[in-house]
Amino acid sequence: MSSNTSRSCSTRSRQNSRVSSQVLVDAKLHGNFEESERLFDYSASINLNMPSSSCEIPSSAVSTYLQKIQRGMLIQPFGCLIVVDEKNLKVIAFSENTQEMLGLIPHTVPSMEQREALTIGTDVKSLFLSPGCSALEKAVDFGEISILNPITLHCRSSSKPFYAILHRIEEGLVIDLEPVSPDEVPVTAAGALRSYKLAAKSISRLQALPSGNMLLLCDALVKEVSELTGYDRVMVYKFHEDGHGEVIAECCREDMEPYLGLHYSATDIPQASRFLFMRNKVRMICDCSAVPVKVVQDKSLSQPISLSGSTLRAPHGCHAQYMSNMGSVASLVMSVTINGSDSDEMNRDLQTGRHLWGLVVCHHASPRFVPFPLRYACEFLTQVFGVQINKEAESAVLLKEKRILQTQSVLCDMLFRNAPIGIVTQSPNIMDLVKCDGAALYYRDNLWSLGVTPTETQIRDLIDWVLKSHGGNTGFTTESLMESGYPDASVLGESICGMAAVYISEKDFLFWFRSSTAKQIKWGGARHDPNDRDGKRMHPRSSFKAFMEIVRWKSVPWDDMEMDAINSLQLIIKGSLQEEHSKTVVDVPLVDNRVQKVDELCVIVNEMVRLIDTAAVPIFAVDASGVINGWNSKAAEVTGLAVEQAIGKPVSDLVEDDSVETVKNMLALALEGSEERGAEIRIRAFGPKRKSSPVELVVNTCCSRDMTNNVLGVCFIGQDVTGQKTLTENYSRVKGDYARIMWSPSTLIPPIFITNENGVCSEWNNAMQKLSGIKREEVVNKILLGEVFTTDDYGCCLKDHDTLTKLRIGFNAVISGQKNIEKLLFGFYHRDGSFIEALLSANKRTDIEGKVTGVLCFLQVPSPELQYALQVQQISEHAIACALNKLAYLRHEVKDPEKAISFLQDLLHSSGLSEDQKRLLRTSVLCREQLAKVISDSDIEGIEEGYVELDCSEFGLQESLEAVVKQVMELSIERKVQISCDYPQEVSSMRLYGDNLRLQQILSETLLSSIRFTPALRGLCVSFKVIARIEAIGKRMKRVELEFRIIHPAPGLPEDLVREMFQPLRKGTSREGLGLHITQKLVKLMERGTLRYLRESEMSAFVILTEFPLI
């Protein structure tokens, strides 16, 4: 078993034991609170110094505690909740405030015949208007449903908008409904990417910070979150290995007590809550004092509904009291997760392999609600912060490991000259190996000590105690001598709490000592006031006091890396002393500092040689005469020439003839002290690769120098670009337009995919299909980041969550116009399970007005330039831009005459017209407004996808019908076709609420098509008929279902035109087909809108059905 594996196993065992113990303590605290409520004595209950085994808590109590946390059946009152069965969308649970929030409670006393609008078994689609219901039905069939959040739903009774936030549980689909503020423009699932833009500037500032300073990064984050959300206090909590938390950054109002530096017990954030933070990255409490709302569920369900994933889940009473005690009413918490080992199962996401590093916590002194889009933006910002933290943590670990290895190497070198005394008498010494307050060597009844250590007598007592109580041949490690049972721990005091002791022979020991953690912790909020009443209440100050009492006799834990270093040094010393037992200790005088530095340098040089030999790029070195004296494994692999065969050969014999002069010039310049970068050379292939083409390398040179800084030779660090060169050269010969490049089956074409401005994939070429194993039809019209590239077991599965976050950052930057993505390295899994690494380049696509319309992406495998493809793409985009320029020109030129017509109509309106003249003027106004509406329609894709919002207002049906008929009169006269209007006075005189201009557009287009395809024979007639059915909604409201029938003689519309009307748009669609297709899509946007085309032997007809509220 490797050291890493053993380290992981030991950590996992230790962490799992800690988590299990902590859950028991959490359950006991919960039980105490439930029993005593407001008389709860926090300080007495948090006595965690007792072993967890002494907490005699039955398993049923723990189960009850966990169920209360996750299945409490209470929500916050700022929203309402509905749970539906996914199979039929029938309601199986709902919160008691749902009917009130959705406006379903009648204002008058209901009669016996009236049924309640919401009960168990109600079809949820009956509660909302049709566009939202369609989105809800689509969501049910969606895999990762959270990608679609939020869905905008409008109440059927009041048209009030809500954000629907969906997630799945075992029983069905949970719909959290949050009201949309009147001054807020609702976003849709397709617009979720836009909410990222709220945090775009904050993300840019965060990424621009210099690396190597984690506290600077945390300080920047709290300021950015504070500006985004407006909370009174924003903090970054970091969880330590023992589970306790620390406030490491804070931004708060000047009049508030600072919490920066506060340490609090692990029980302040229970393990169950940490588990929920891994599932739900954002948690908002609007008002901790608000009375929670109960959830009613179907009695046939076997257990209470799980609310663990709900954004509305009510805070537990214990947490609400804690918030109240510290003067906080509202909070917003975001989890920070990073990559980690599998050591902490409770705080680890089993799907992503990430664990909970800490939290970003916002507090406010008054109730505060943050809408979903802003919460989503904050979540994204926190994800970016997590990526940065992950980098900083990894860098810190590598730096620590490097420092330990360097110190260990020097200590080992000392052992060969002065074993073992040199490691405590020279510099560096064993105190430099790991962080400690003191260290000691007890060897052959003599003691050498450094820093803060026990006395020699106390050291001997410690040795006797370790041998007696913890016998073995390895040693003993503890962070608390007091808790480990050392009888004289109190005598040693808080200066010596933690100890690492290892055997180097039968009675010889190495010691490292650490003082109490409490000595290292300072919090500005800590104070000692006899009148302080926080001592027994749940409050940060009492929590800090409890924590300080817990760590009074504890040191910082010894981490696995430190123990690996200590155990490695132990083994080395044991080995060096095996032959020395019979010899006396000889204290060799200190060597000259220069000799010592040379020895240290030798150790480092040996390590560098190993790193060079195992590097993933070809590296070779030559002496001043050009003879090879270094040839690493990668160079041997790419050329086929073994190391022993390359050493001693002139470099000119190994390179192609056309590269000899280049190499000689580089060598000459290097010997003069000038180093080259990015030079291209070609090396011959040998052995099995002899028949292959030469190896193409892009190399940098660096000089090899001696102790006096004289140049001895040159080192060439190369990058193998043979594949890229071959692909680029072949590809430069490919001719053709953009479509041929996109869909050519040639392997020379790079993988290409395209998204629109909402992040939805619109293209996926053959090369991308082959590279990923996923067909085009499986990804087009799906969200690229989350549905195509995922961290789950479908689509192109990415390596980890960080990769997905980096891609989101990059795409957000491209779409917001900040910068393009240039050769971003990322990897994903092929459908067959193989892992693929590639370089991603992405460029924004814009329309004629400079607005970003999407992103063009192509992969380089392995990193070819493919300049020709980009040129072809630019030509194609230029052609499209020219066409859009013409269209924009026409739109612009029409606007001025349209404004003039509007001005003249306003003048006529105030000039004393007769009633007939006013009616004609009103008809012309409606026609002009309809024209302006059509001209402004630039988002055909939005109409196609059903994302266009209707512009609703009160209107008269008679006026709209007259405007429709007037639009078709000229064509009617031209083709000698009569129009028969059949709509009763009581129908035409109706006042309705809806989008009258869209209704005019629909009716005029279908009426024109009917006349256009009626034979031009005198006497033929097109019938325009309107049928109304009025339905009462409660006592006061009514709605009318309108049926428009446009009947025209056979043969009617051509079959091809009917197909174009109902089928998706495709290349080559006729103008008439486009008009009817858009009309059919607009009908679907109307309330319960449907359009059918009926064909009989003698007659054909358009039948249009829709509903309007009746004023």
From Swiss-Prot:
Contains one covalently linked phytochromobilin chromophore. Residues 889-1111 form the Histidine kinase domain. It comes from the Eukaryota. Residues 213-393 form the GAF domain. Keywords: Chromophore, Photoreceptor protein, Receptor, Repeat, Sensory transduction, Transcription, Transcription regulation. GO terms for molecular function: photoreceptor activity; protein homodimerization activity. Pfam families: GAF, HATPase_c, PAS, PAS_2, PHY. Regulatory photoreceptor which exists in two forms that are reversibly interconvertible by light: the Pr form that absorbs maximally in the red region of the spectrum and the Pfr form that absorbs maximally in the far-red region. Photoconversion of Pr to Pfr induces an array of morphogenic responses, whereas reconversion of Pfr to Pr cancels the induction of those responses. Pfr controls the expression of a number of nuclear genes including those encoding the small subunit of ribulose-bisphosphate carboxylase, chlorophyll A/B binding protein, protochlorophyllide reductase, rRNA, etc. Homodimer. NCBIfam families: sensory_box. This is Phytochrome C. It comes from Arabidopsis thaliana (Mouse-ear cress).
